[in-house]
């Protein structure tokens, strides 16, 4: 399997984990030194991401659809860029919402495994 294919497989696994509410599977996508920057929010670590996503999974039925525009690999570093659509439905009733976001992720390969080390996203207008 090429590095490009391995990264695409990791992205597909991320979406499967997110869509099934599998927090452990979702967190496996990220490097332990993760720094995540989201629009309008402070940067967060992997532990902070875990707390936030745990709360989201508890409160909402979730779905993510990812469209990769670009995957580029250079040695043990890579980046991906694309668009994802998150759909959330409150578990206690309420209106389903969709949010379209553009993302950029920086990947690091360690011990043969690709993980996201840095990620940022913003709302598409």
Where are these regions (language model features)?
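A solvent-exposed, acidic/Ser-Thr-rich amphipathic alpha-helical stretch
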Residues: 4-10, 20-74, 83, 95-99
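Short beta-strand edge/turn micro-motifs at domain boundaries
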Residues: 100-125
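Flexible, membrane-facing loop/turn or short amphipathic-helix motifs
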Residues: 91-93
